[in-house]
């Protein structure tokens, strides 16, 4: 029937769009694992993946690209949504780590099909640009090596307490912690 063919057409459009995104992300990942992709020319590039992101450690910098996924409680399936959530990640995380979260940078494709950070051409993706944290200064490492003394722990506690005292509360924020919302996001 006509309704069924419209639904099938929408499903086909959706699926082909997701396939195109995965292919595009494949070329982005391939390019971003090469040291010559980056303007600062790191010696090596390491790739780590989470369920929602590709994380490229490129010398002194880290680039995080969101995967085109939809888990219901978050939807990164369009370029516009990924840009929005990159900007939100930058805005939110700068509150605690302004010297670490540096920018949101576009990944571009030029007329020859070459990819670059910034530059000219068509924006095909966005990445959160961060300063790389020295491993020996990470709290997780300091704790594992029994080097997180009282002064370090007091400084962390004070920073977290200041953050929570200044954080917005009420209304929609309270609703996010409701049983109904939590159940919806986990079922």
Features from the language model and the residues they span:
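Conserved ATP-binding subdomain of kinase catalytic cores across diverse folds
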Residues: 25-187
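Cysteine-centered motifs
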Residues: 14-15
């Amino acid at each position: 029937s006509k309704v069924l063919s419209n639904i099938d057409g929408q499903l086909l459009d959706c699926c082909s769009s997701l396939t195109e995104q995965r292919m595009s992300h494949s070329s982005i990942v391939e390019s971003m694992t090469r040291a010559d992709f980056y303007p600062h020319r790191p010696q090596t590039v390491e790739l780590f993946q989470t369920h929602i992101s590709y994380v490229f450690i490129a010398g002194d910098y880290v680039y995080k690209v969101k995967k085109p996924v939809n888990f219901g409680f978050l939807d990164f399936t369009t370029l516009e949504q990924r840009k929005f959530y990159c900007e939100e990640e930058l805005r939110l995380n700068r509150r605690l780590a302004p010297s670490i979260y540096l920018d949101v940078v576009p990944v571009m494709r030029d007329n020859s099909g070459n990819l670059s950070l910034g530059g000219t051409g068509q924006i095909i993706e966005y990445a959160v640009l961060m300063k790389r944290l020295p491993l020996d200064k990470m709290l997780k490492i300091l704790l594992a090596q029994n080097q997180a003394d009282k002064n370090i722990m007091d400084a962390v506690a004070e920073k977290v307490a200041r953050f929570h005292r200044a954080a917005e509360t009420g209304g929609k924020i309270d609703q996010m912690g409701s049983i109904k919302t939590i159940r919806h996001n986990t079922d």
